[in-house]
């Protein structure tokens, strides 16, 4: 099954048709209306996150045409196979020189303390949306905290449903759609010998994290040493998606999406070839005010000035 199959579309579907199909399926499988549809909801969101972006769609379409890749993914659950071979090492290996990579702009993200974007993080809303997404309700203590906000309180006093107020006030479906910004997309160079010998390949990465209990609501980086044993039948252009191995914040987790590149000689083992996080730091888990709407968040952190906003 490929991404078009998940959205019940032919591979010739346009961006407009993809958006229409996504909205239709999202309503059908959303956890709020279909308690058994949460996994399908995640899958169609993953599919939409790639196919709705013209650049990602073009890359994915080209990958479908590489060798017999399209036939393979229709007849084999690749993600299951990759996860069986996937390992996460908990300790750093001394021979992995992360400082060597840190100077490579194509490899690591720029520090958040140096970015030029002003993004506003609202921890309570992020947690509320994660709880709605994962279990369809908001914890009592968090609900009490949100009800103290003037805009929420005033809306609820007009006999509006609390959850619907939160969704509407802070654009729940926009945030769900933006989940793709937590994915990490990489290209991995492999040789035929490594594939034949089923070598173990290491993927050292820096992951962006905000923990639920992180007091200052600031991003920080952690090193993760991912590795997996290669399968003997890897083809050039094949995609492996490791769920929940990407960037993460306040319960939300992105995916690690790896595109295999078979080469005669490895020149650069690992390359981040697409990162929404680098292109736009204002999307996920952030509500950025515009000319028509003032910032409704309280006590939030401005990444441009590095200060909290009263």
From Swiss-Prot:
The yes or no answer to whether the keyword Oxidoreductase is present is no
PANTHER family per record: DNAJ HOMOLOG SUBFAMILY B MEMBER 9
Please state what is observed when this gene is inactivated: Not essential, it can be deleted.
Pfam families reported for this sequence: DnaJ
Q: Which GO terms describe its molecular function?
A: misfolded protein binding; protein-folding chaperone binding
List the protein's name.
Answer: DnaJ-like protein MG002
List, for all copies, the residue spans of the domain called J: 1-66
Q: What InterPro entries does this protein map onto?
A: DnaJ_domain, DnaJ_domain_CS, Hsp70_co-chaperone_J-domain, J_dom_sf
Q: Which UniProt keywords apply?
A: Chaperone
Q: Which CDD domains match?
A: DnaJ
Q: What is the lineage of its organism?
A: Bacteria, Bacillati, Mycoplasmatota, Mycoplasmoidales, Mycoplasmoidaceae
């Amino acid at each position: 099954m490929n991404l078009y199959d998940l959205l019940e579309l032919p591979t010739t579907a346009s961006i407009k048709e993809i958006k229409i199909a996504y909205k239709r399926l999202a309503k059908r499988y959303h956890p709020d209306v279909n308690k058994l549809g949460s996994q399908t909801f995640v899958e169609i969101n993953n599919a939409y996150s790639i196919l709705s972006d013209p650049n990602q769609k073009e890359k994915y379409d080209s990958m479908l045409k590489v060798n017999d890749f399209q036939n393979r993914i229709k007849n084999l659950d690749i993600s299951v196979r990759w996860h069986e071979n996937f390992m996460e090492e908990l300790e750093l290996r001394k021979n992995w020189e992360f400082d060597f990579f840190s100077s490579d702009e194509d490899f690591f993200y720029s520090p958040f303390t140096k970015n030029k974007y002003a993004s506003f993080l609202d921890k309570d809303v992020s947690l509320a949306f994660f709880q709605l997404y994962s279990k369809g309700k908001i914890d009592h203590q968090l609900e009490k905290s949100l009800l103290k906000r003037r805009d929420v309180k005033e809306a609820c006093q007009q006999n509006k449903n609390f959850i619907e107020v939160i969704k509407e006030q802070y654009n729940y479906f926009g945030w769900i759609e933006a989940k793709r910004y937590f994915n990490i997309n990489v290209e991995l160079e492999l040789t035929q010998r490594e594939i034949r010998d089923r070598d173990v390949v290491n993927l050292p990465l820096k992951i962006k994290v905000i923990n639920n209990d992180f007091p200052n609501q600031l991003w920080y980086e952690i090193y993760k040493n991912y590795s997996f044993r290669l399968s003997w039948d890897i083809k050039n252009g094949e995609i492996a998606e490791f769920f929940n191995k990407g960037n993460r914040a306040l319960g939300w987790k992105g995916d690690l999406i790896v595109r295999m590149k078979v080469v005669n000689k490895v020149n650069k083992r690992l390359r981040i070839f697409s990162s929404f996080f680098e292109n736009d730091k204002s999307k996920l888990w952030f509500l950025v005010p515009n000319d028509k709407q003032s910032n409704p968040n309280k006590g939030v952190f401005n990444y441009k000035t590095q200060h909290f906003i009263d």
